[in-house]
Amino acid sequence: MPKYHLKAPYSPKGDQPTAIARLVEGVNQGQRYQTLLGATGTGKTFTIANLIAQTGRPALVLAHNKTLAAQLCNEFREFFPDNSVEYFISYYDYYQPEAYVPVSDTYIAKTSSINEEIDMLRHSATRSLFERNDVIVVASISCIYGLGIPSEYLKAAVKFKVGETLNIRSALRELVENQYSRNDIDITRGRFRVRGDVLEIGPAYEDRLVRIELFGDEVEAIRYLDPTTGEILQSLEAINIYPAKHFVTPKERLNVAVQAIRDELRGRLQFLNEQGKLLEAQRLEQRTTYDLEMLREVGYCNGVENYARHLAGRSAGTPPECLIDYFPEDWLLVVDESHVTCSQLKAMYNGDQARKKVLIEHGFRLPSAADNRPLKSEEFWSKARQTVFVSATPGDWELKQSDGHLAEQVIRPTGVLDPLVEVRPTQGQVDDLLAEIRIRAEKQERVLITTLTKRMAEDLTDYLAENDVRVRYLHSEIHSIERIEIIQDLRLGEYDVLVGVNLLREGLDLPEVSLVVILDADKEGFLRAERSLIQTIGRAARHVDGMALLYADNLTDSMSRAISETERRREIQKAYNELNGIVPRPAGKRASNSILSFLELSRRLQTDGKDADLVQITGRAVDALDSDQDAGLALDALPELIDQLETKMKEAAKNLNFEEAASLRDRIKKFRQKLIRNT
């Protein structure tokens, strides 16, 4: 059994010991589904850490967004400094999928931007799963997408061992086949160089260099080096260098795959011709024939993922292998904020297939492209042997699956009570809100404000900034790493107020926040449903003076139930504190930034020398610009305009408005060329 060393400056308190014991018993007895129902701030993460430590299982902790995943990863790294805690999220900073719009006969090629630091962390996760059994991987929903074949990835690793004979030519050939490139001048991740009897490699999964020192044909030494100073960090007896990409296809399998693709193409062309779809048949034949030539000659082509089923040797309709398949058999799944995450699992497959269907029907892809997909919900759950759902508001599906196997946490170890909830009328709400913000700012406390629409959030941010409030606006187009920075800066006091739409609910650990404001609380819908209201109110549940302000003119059923549940928990907590002589105290949790320091950010805010708030709120200025005005733009205005256009392009791609995204992409390209010509 893996040995987890849980290190914490405190021991389980309140109802944590009971919850831990119940969950551990359930896992040891083989219970497939359990639920930890814990109010915000009751230490659910610490309870799960104790569960993992006591059961000794490799664990996958699934979060519904990248920000929450980063926060959880930080916490688990603090609890388990001697064990392997990994971070696995999508490595795309920007991703516009391949698409076709039949109405306008517009084809849009796939465009993307990969974050190299996150790619390194993904490789680090799979490497740890192969080499250790004390592994906790904190992941987003991206873990249900195809990730090569674990057995081939492991088999392809290039092995070095001190004292063994090494054929250097064979080793270099294997590195190239594993998609490492030779560069004798600049060595970074995914590259290697040879200098005399020394081979240096930049592994895909870490930022240290590996030096293999030879004496003749014998491996004399293996060392880790600092990539900047060249200082020797560690000496090793043996090492495996895993492929630079997760998708590894042996030569013999590639030949079989090429033939299978050719056979499928032949059958599909016959079908299209019989249907009288001559244009589609010609298009498909031309594209696929070119791809086959590229695969045969260099082993790769643009859009190679569309042939993943053939390259992996899978049958039609079979699920792809993903991160889950890299885990050993006795792994444990923890689904954080399960009421949101489980719904996401169900939605991913349908959205992917709708887009692929159009591409296949119009001759852009073979039918097998549909098998390059995320797991279906039922496929995912069939792979999960034991699951613990974690939420303050678990969904009906999770409760049904758990079948009464439930552990509840209401008591906070700090003695902090659930926030006071106050409903105020909407008339004069902005001025009232401004007064409340100033009170908190004087006490160096933080405020979260959630609105119903993006436009409303932008307008409110504008107004607060004009009234000298230190405010930021958190929106969906912000890169995942920058999003983590924004949360970090709020905690560190760089600003006092954070405004958002649906980004301020589940799981955010912000003990400095004393006030949560919910505008339009009486507008029934997803964002103002009972569970959403309870979650949003809970963002102030880590502060001794926590308070939630709901601006509304009516008391809806959702509001009434959310307020009643908050008051019920508050009464239980108050009674426990009185019985045990507990005085509420601040959480005192420091603002950890281990993910940020680990990543060596490729960029920070794009506002060097400018007012951050102004740049954040002027995105709508892009709407006033059309292509006829582009020629007259001043050069010094182009960098900011490019940033704003990129934001709009990403929003359009996210909303499946591919024509607008492609148009914006072309304008960005034109502006960049103009900058290059004139600088």
Curated annotation (Swiss-Prot):
- The answer to whether the entry has keyword Ion transport is no
The name under which this protein is listed is UvrABC system protein B
Which protein family is it in? Belongs to the UvrB family.
Motif (Beta-hairpin) on chain: 91-114
**Role according to the record:** The UvrABC repair system catalyzes the recognition and processing of DNA lesions. A damage recognition complex composed of 2 UvrA and 2 UvrB subunits scans DNA for abnormalities. Upon binding of the UvrA(2)B(2) complex to a putative damaged site, the DNA wraps around one UvrB monomer. DNA wrap is dependent on ATP binding by UvrB and probably causes local melting of the DNA helix, facilitating insertion of UvrB beta-hairpin between the DNA strands. Then UvrB probes one DNA strand for the presence of a lesion.
Instruction: Show where the Helicase ATP-binding domain sits.
Output: 25-412
Q: Could you tell me which SMART domains the record lists for this protein?
A: DEXDc (SM00487), HELICc (SM00490)
- Keyword Iron applies: no
**Occurrences of domain UVR (ranges):** 639-674
- A GO term from the CC aspect: cytoplasm
- Residue positions annotated to bind ATP are 38-45
What is the top-level taxon of the source organism? Bacteria
Q: What is known of its domains?
A: The beta-hairpin motif is involved in DNA binding.
The residues covered by the Helicase C-terminal domain are: 429-591
Q: HAMAP family attached here? A: UvrB
Keyword terms, alphabetized = ATP-binding, Cytoplasm, DNA damage, DNA excision, DNA repair, Excision nuclease, Nucleotide-binding, SOS response
Tell me, which GO biological process terms does this entry list?
Answer: nucleotide-excision repair; SOS response
Q: How does it assemble?
A: Forms a heterotetramer with UvrA during the search for lesions. Interacts with UvrC in an incision complex.
Its localization reads:
Cytoplasm
Q: Which organism is it from?
A: Prochlorococcus marinus (strain MIT 9313)
Molecular function, one GO term:
DNA binding
Which InterPro entries does the record match to this protein?
Helicase/UvrB_N, Helicase_ATP-bd, Helicase_C-like, P-loop_NTPase, UVR_dom, UVR_dom_sf, UvrB, UvrB_inter
